[in-house]
């Protein structure tokens, strides 16, 4: 990857010194509490969140500047100077092969950096992902996009024509759609670029970034991103390739390591939390109510059964899903109730699990305060375990004396116990992720030669056609078709023979880094020798076209 040169040396040096000073305490905290492996994953999140500087690539100027450009007016260039980063880059003579290409960027907020109160406002339902992709790709500096929105994270992946401008536009879009001020989003978000972004989605897919390390549900959610993205124009080649490769990595990690062995899911952690809060003698007798029979609700039911629960009430919009679950678990008494009877069922329950896609609260303080008290055999407290995002249960209910509400952020208490063992297993997974990240970046680099191949062939074809016409005109109009065809075939054969060598040097599958480096050097050499259009000009044209389209 070439280094962008958007900043002068003095300004860059000052910025890096300031960022290093600000992040020193964070580094000390990370190293003192986490093992080496965990530090390599988490430090990247923390440093991006607080400084915008990657601990791995401190000399990526746009990367180092992206957070500051959005939030700090002192470092923004004067408004009178409207030179874009691309124009500055064109005049730079740092490296004869230096150029800027589209960057993969992730703008994210997760359970590690952001409270559930903010995540629920930013959450995008799966049905809205295509619309969100369309709106994101309508921004001036965004080419491709994908949305990964779960109960633990809200992450937007984009291919940006300019890093800091793309981040600024996406952050403003997030603010507009959620109603959260840009400044507040910037306090909690993390930013990752190119290889760091690649490693992040691979870690996510492998379950290394989950609250419950190694859990399998996130892989299904990554698959769903690809499924929903198929046919959506903005889910382009780079983003599609990234997520498909992430699925491969997630499968490989689970196959080649034992990270998934004994791992708990969010649903099982919710059940464990409920049992931790109940007196042990009441585990078999507590009255259980599950609201929502979707994927999460079904898993809650399965884990309750695994813990010895033989009777429960399930409230759902329709009976069809509950019937299907009942067929799977014929030895368990599962009683279906419609949503209209939700409050009456709650009055008769000791523990209530909520896992619906409702965007509004199902339970408010006014609804719960008049419910009859629960027995002392279950501790005298009615428990609400809310694993929905947005939340289904109002936090103010916790103010009632005989009620306790727990949400997904409270599950950390459960997973802490067996996290150390899975961290050891995760070390094995990290080597796989590093290897796969290199392969993906090499594949992406190899794509750069495709436009040059097309341009070189088109250039040769223009010359062939022009010279063929000259030849045929000199031969006269009465030449036989057979002769005309033979001359045409001759010209094509000569061109193909001449192009064979250069084309071979431009084709690379990305598997060999040495070959890839030579291929990219050959590409730049051919661009210069034949005055082919440069990648910088392509980026400028794309940005100009998007701006003009948005102004119509």
Swiss-Prot record:
The keyword Transcription regulation does not apply. Pathway: Porphyrin-containing compound metabolism; protoporphyrin-IX biosynthesis; 5-aminolevulinate from L-glutamyl-tRNA(Glu): step 1/2. NADP(+) binds at residues 292-297. GO terms for biological process: chlorophyll biosynthetic process; protoporphyrinogen IX biosynthetic process. It is found in: Plastid, Chloroplast. The active site is at 151 (nucleophile). Its EC number is 1.2.1.70. It catalyses: (S)-4-amino-5-oxopentanoate + tRNA(Glu) + NADP(+) = L-glutamyl-tRNA(Glu) + NADPH + H(+). Transmembrane segments: none annotated. GO terms for cellular component: chloroplast. Substrate binds at residues 150-153, 210, 215-217, 221. One of its GO terms (molecular function) is NADP binding. CDD domains: NAD_bind_Glutamyl_tRNA_reduct. The record marks 200 as: Important for activity. Pfam families: GlutR_dimer, GlutR_N, Shikimate_DH. NCBIfam families: hemA, PRK00045.1-3. Belongs to the glutamyl-tRNA reductase family. This is Glutamyl-tRNA reductase 1, chloroplastic. It comes from Cucumis sativus. The lineage of its organism: Eukaryota, Viridiplantae, Streptophyta, Embryophyta, Tracheophyta. The gene is HEMA1.
């Amino acid at each position: 990857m070439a280094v962008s040169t958007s900043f002068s040396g003095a300004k860059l040096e000052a910025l890096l010194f300031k960022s290093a000073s600000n992040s020193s305490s964070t580094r000390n905290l990370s190293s003192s509490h986490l093992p080496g492996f965990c530090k390599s994953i988490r430090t990247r999140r923390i440093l991006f969140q607080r400084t915008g500087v990657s601990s791995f690539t401190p000399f990526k100027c746009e990367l180092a500047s992206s957070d500051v450009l959005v939030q700090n007016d002192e470092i923004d260039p004067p408004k009178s100077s409207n030179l874009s980063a691309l124009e500055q880059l064109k005049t730079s003579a740092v490296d004869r092969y230096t150029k800027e290409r589209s960057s993969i960027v992730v703008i994210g907020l997760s359970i590690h950096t952001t409270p559930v109160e903010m995540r629920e406002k930013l959450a995008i339902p799966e049905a809205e992902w295509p619309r969100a992709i369309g709106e994101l790709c309508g921004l001036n500096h965004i080419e491709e996009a994908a949305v990964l929105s779960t109960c633990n994270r809200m992450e937007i992946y984009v291919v940006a024509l300019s890093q800091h401008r793309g981040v600024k536009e996406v952050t403003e879009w997030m603010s507009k759609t959620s109603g959260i001020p840009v400044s507040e989003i910037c306090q909690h978000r993390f930013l990752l670029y190119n290889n760091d972004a690649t490693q992040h989605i691979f870690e996510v897919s492998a379950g290394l970034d989950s609250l419950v390390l190694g859990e399998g549900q996130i892989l299904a959610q990554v698959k769903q991103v690809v499924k929903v993205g198929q046919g959506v124009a903005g889910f382009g080649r780079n983003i599609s390739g990234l997520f498909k490769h992430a699925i491969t990595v997630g499968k490989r990690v689970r196959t080649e390591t034992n990270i998934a062995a004994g791992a708990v899911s969010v649903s099982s952690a919710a059940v464990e939390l409920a049992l931790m809060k109940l007196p042990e003698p009441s585990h078999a007798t507590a009255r259980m109510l599950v609201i929502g029979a979707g994927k999460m609700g079904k898993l809650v039911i399965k884990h309750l059964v695994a813990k010895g629960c033989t009777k429960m009430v399930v409230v759902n919009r329709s009976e069809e899903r509950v019937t299907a679950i009942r067929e799977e678990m014929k030895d368990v008494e599962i009683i279906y109730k419609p949503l209209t009877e939700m409050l009456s069922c709650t009055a008769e329950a000791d523990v209530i699990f909520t896992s619906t896609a409702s965007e509004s609260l199902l339970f408010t303080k006014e609804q719960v305060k008049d419910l009859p008290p629960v027995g002392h055999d279950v501790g005298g407290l009615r428990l609400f375990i809310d694993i929905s995002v947005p939340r289904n249960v109002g936090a103010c209910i916790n103010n009632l004396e005989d009620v306790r509400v727990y949400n997904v952020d409270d599950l950390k208490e459960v997973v802490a116990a067996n996290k150390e063992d899975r961290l050891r297993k995760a070390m094995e997974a990290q080597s796989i992720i590093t290897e796969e990240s290199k392969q993906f970046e090499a594949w992406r680099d190899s794509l750069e030669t495709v436009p040059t191949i097309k341009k070189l062939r088109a250039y040769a074809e223009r010359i062939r056609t022009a010279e063929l016409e000259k030849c045929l005109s000199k031969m006269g109009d009465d030449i036989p078709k057979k002769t005309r065809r033979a001359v045409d075939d001759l010209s094509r054969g000569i061109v193909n023979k001449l192009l064979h060598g250069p084309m071979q040097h431009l084709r690379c599958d990305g598997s060999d880094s040495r070959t890839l480096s030579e291929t990219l050097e050959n590409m730049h050499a051919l661009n210069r020798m034949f005055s082919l259009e440069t990648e910088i000009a392509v980026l400028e044209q794309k940005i100009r076209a998007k701006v003009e389209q948005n102004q119509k």
